[in-house]
Regions:
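Long, compositionally biased charged/polar accessory segments in the mid-to-C-terminal portions
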Residues: 34, 39-188
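Short, aromatic/basic amphipathic alpha-helical patches
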Residues: 2-3, 28-32
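Internal, well-ordered alpha-helical segments in soluble enzyme and binding-protein domains
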Residues: 12, 22-26, 89-92
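Active-site adenylate/phosphate-handling loop in enzymes that bind or generate adenylated species
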Residues: 15-16, 115
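A short alpha->loop->secondary-structure connector
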Residues: 3-15
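Short, charged, surface-exposed secondary-structure boundary motifs
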Residues: 19-29, 120
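Gly/Ser/Thr-rich loops at beta-strand to alpha-helix junctions
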Residues: 1, 19-21, 51
Length: 188
């Protein structure tokens, strides 16, 4: 609907999302890290693979203006604990109208590894992604890229990650979400 007319060479893709924290909460987190590290962050990588590889997806790397680069392992950092406990989700995420099995795109993409319900033969230390064709164009694309990548067909039941068929649920102890967190512009 957005593009008004159909484009034959356009493929659309959507991403299965865990939830999104507010820009204000992220800005507050960056300020906290700057104070703790006594410096100014120039970059933060929340999925750093440089020190421990792909098997440790929750390694954080902080690059600072003075040239320091620091690594914090796993979920020991405040951000990871809050994010994965669903304590900083935007309320709109819990009502997301796009989170359902009737996807509007040609292809749906998701992280698909380290899932307790995943078939053991699909596990890989390099990670596994879900590529789900939703249209004929999506099926053609998957057939076209099948050669250079390793693909396995799975049942629809196998694809039912918690965030695919329905929005994430709110944490029962989630604090009231600050009103200004919705409108706060993100800062570098």
């Amino acid at each position: 609907r957005f593009l008004i007319k159909k484009y034959d060479n356009l493929l659309t893709m959507d991403v299965v999302c865990h939830a999104v924290p507010s820009p204000q909460i992220f800005s507050d987190y960056i300020s906290l890290v700057n104070r703790r590290l006594k410096g100014r962050l120039t970059d933060i990588n929340m999925r750093d693979k440089s020190t421990r590889g792909w098997s440790h997806a929750f390694t954080y790397r902080y690059d600072l203006a003075d040239g320091r680069s620091l690594v914090d392992q796993d979920k020991t950092v405040d951000w990871g604990r809050l994010f994965f406990a669903k304590l900083i989700d935007r309320p709109s995420c819990h009502e997301c109208k796009y989170t359902n099995l009737n996807r509007a795109s040609d292809i749906t993409v998701a992280d698909f590894w380290d899932d307790d319900n995943m078939r053991p033969d699909l596990r890989s230390p390099l990670g596994t992604s879900l590529l789900m064709a939703n249209t004929d164009a999506g099926e053609r694309l998957l057939r076209d890229v099948a050669d250079p990548i390793t693909m396995s067909a799975i049942t629809e039941r196998d694809t039912l990650q918690s965030s695919l068929p329905r929005p994430p649920s709110a944490h029962s102890r989630s604090p009231p979400f600050p009103r200004d967190s919705h409108a706060h512009p993100s800062r570098p």
